[in-house]
Amino acid sequence: DFVSIGTNDLTQYTMAADRLLGDLAHLNNPWQPAVLKMIKLTVKGAKRASVNAGEKKYVSVCGEAAADPALAVVLVGLGVDTLSMNAGAIPAVAAVLKSVTLEQARHIANKALEQISSAEAKAAARAELPILDELGL
């Protein structure tokens, strides 16, 4: 058993903003702290279900968020087990993930969660990931 989080839909419904409405497009950003908190709560629920069931419930994230190298670090730091993305995104995501420990990913995730806006959350995470600039990301 596993839990799969579709970040595109999660973001749309968490922010109550239709992706097709231009005036609300700025809200459809998976870096929104509210969306990150929903992911964290989902992971926590899956861990609780794992204890109750006596077997691990894996949490997977699919959608554009998993393909963002900086956000992938945050997702892993939040406890996400697997990331589903298009093949073209794998090299950059893998390079960035290999550059941090799990403890560092958790620290970066917490920094993002502390922010008020999506822009601040993204900036806080990127500030902790100098490899992004080194790789031109």
Give the positions of each predicted feature.
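Non-catalytic helical/linker scaffolds that mediate oligomerization, partner binding
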Residues: 1-137
